[in-house]
């Protein structure tokens, strides 16, 4: 119960989306605000404040690289803190060397089939929000670089 009340307090303060554009419900504050307030939060409870930090990374990624449709659909709920976000990067064979990633994403109609194994997904499962947006690093066929695939609807990931 404590962590839910703490997250509600953080969410209601506007901290989660403080540096996001106002058009998505954010505060429009400079990024230095996030750095300073994040340092204070991390000093008090690093494990907890990883959640909003990971959400911030997901928001910035969608803001910078997402289509207009993705921005309109997901940023308001992430910015408000109603949803949280993660980055699914680490695999057993590549801790910090992401070039060794083996997970693939194969296009099928209007979605992708992901094949691979991710480990250590910080804040990948919790009960603080009704939904968690997962940005999954994977290889697409014929793509020269790695890609991020979003899993955005409440779903159960299968082993």
Segments predicted by a language model, with ranges:
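Active-site loops and adjacent core secondary-structure elements that bind or stabilize anionic groups
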Residues: 1
């Amino acid at each position: 119960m404590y962590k839910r009340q703490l997250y509600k307090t953080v969410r209601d303060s506007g901290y989660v989306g403080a540096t996001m554009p106002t058009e998505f419900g954010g505060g429009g504050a400079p990024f230095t605000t996030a750095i300073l307030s994040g340092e204070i939060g991390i000093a008090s409870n690093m494990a907890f404040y990883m959640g909003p930090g990971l959400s911030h990374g997901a928001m910035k990624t969608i803001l910078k690289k997402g289509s207009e449709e993705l921005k309109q659909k997901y940023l308001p709920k992430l910015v408000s803190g109603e949803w949280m976000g993660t980055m699914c990067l680490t695999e057993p064979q590549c801790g910090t060397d992401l070039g060794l990633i083996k997970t693939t994403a194969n296009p099928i109609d209007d979605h992708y089939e992901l094949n691979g194994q991710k480990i250590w997904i910080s804040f990948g499962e919790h009960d603080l929000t009704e939904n968690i947006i997962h940005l999954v690093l994977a290889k697409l066929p014929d793509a020269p670089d790695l890609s991020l695939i979003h899993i955005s609807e409440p779903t159960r990931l299968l082993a």
